[in-house]
């Protein structure tokens, strides 16, 4: 029997000497068992003995080793999440040094494009190769990209460095969640995964504050140098304390190459790049009807159809095995995470703009005013993780999170130039509560309800969908903001050039204008920012609808077992 044929299913199931499952037997067994499990799951008939979380758990850590691994993973997640937004407040200084105003969009998108593009590929790498070494390789690539960004003498070098860092970053969030799932029993995973995901959310919020502080007081290059010591600590900790070196599936190199789904990857990677470029360029750099934007959307559609067809044909060898999406808990969680993450990042990007433009805060002050969101997010992420572990239920937390997100988004959309601290502090606390309670739950779903052989791919899938939701809807919000502000300026202040006002940035308003003109511009900025919050309201409401399909059934494994 050829290697490729064996991948499609062997005659019997067997385990390797190292404890990993053979690829040829895995495919046949997973297809049969997962089909049976999915059917029963949809009917709500899966009992505790049948659930995959009853599998024997190995590699569990305790004591100081678990503490060290958790700290190391948090350092790594902190850095990779910082890179999503830290460059925003450093852009003016970077463009001034490199004389590269036309490259501004690439400073953020280069990292985002490569991160989203390779996340699913890392899911397959984590399936066929030891998690430890794949993770350390991704961390090395991320650190290399950060180093290039720090030392680069040109704008092109910065863009290339950001792209390289994104290649590594695409494997670090899902890898961190996989490592922690290997280190703790399934009953405790929600608590630990919740804490790690809270670090991701917190870093996304405070990144602009750190970027502004580095730019103002040291150098913008420290936005990237900061990753080096944190990454080194993470690498040392994982290298010496995490000893799980067995791949999920044992296979020959040729079988691994086929199992990595090269055809699917060849259509997926350029397809995602086309989608993200189209959403970032459309309405901002080029009109939506521009031939380049239309061509990108068309190419994305063609590549998406090809990718779906290849996934259906490849089945168990696919980047995303189709059976994973049959269970309503999985696709419901994916849709929920996509929408909730889009809402969250809309506020992460535009609340600081409201503080700076409407209330006259500096970049550093706006970061400080975001602390209610940061603190409440961390507190309730930890609390929700513990409560999920204690109660064993996921659905109620998703519904509560989405409902509170809808309410807090609605309240934030009522902000006015005259709004006091009590309003924006209270609304942010409520928003932090909603995000903290539910942001990480889609990861809980895949790590507590799927077989261990599916967890790497499913974790990468959920991570990718959440990142994609943030990337797409931030671009949509940006277009809504620019279009609304430009339209209002042309209508109310026709003597001003809307492009000049927008490009000057929110922190420059009070230095360029005064009197009645400034008062009017502040009101127009307020309206434009609030306009993006309407998008967040819709996304939060959509996440609530998605949460309603999640089954209210206790997790497979009770606490303490």
From Swiss-Prot:
Function: Efflux pump; part of the gene cluster that mediates the biosynthesis of bifonsecin B, a dimeric gamma-naphthopyrone.
Gene Ontology molecular function, alphabetical: transmembrane transporter activity
Gene name of the encoded protein: bfoC
Entry-linked Gene3D superfamilies: MFS general substrate transporter like domains (1.20.1250.20), Multidrug resistance protein D (1.20.1720.10)
Keywords: Cell membrane, Membrane, Transmembrane, Transmembrane helix
Region (Disordered): 1-55
Superkingdom, natural source: Eukaryota
SUPFAM superfamilies, per the entry: MFS general substrate transporter
Name of a matching Pfam family: MFS_1
Basic and acidic residues composition bias: residue spans: 38-55
Family as reported in the entry's similarity comment: Belongs to the major facilitator superfamily. TCR/Tet family.
Record-linked PANTHER family: MAJOR FACILITATOR SUPERFAMILY (PTHR23501), MFS EFFLUX TRANSPORTER INPD-RELATED (PTHR23501:SF199)
Positions of transmembrane segments: 59-79, 103-123, 128-148, 164-184, 194-214, 222-242, 257-277, 293-313, 335-355, 378-398, 425-445, 457-477, 530-550
Protein known as: Efflux pump bfoC
Amino acid composition bias (Polar residues), ranges on this chain: 24-36
Subcellular localization: Cell membrane
Principal subcellular localisation of the protein: membrane
InterPro entries per the UniProt record, alphabetical: MFS (IPR011701), MFS_dom (IPR020846), MFS_trans_sf (IPR036259), Sugar_transporter_CS (IPR005829)
Membrane topology term: Multi-pass membrane protein
GO CC list: plasma membrane
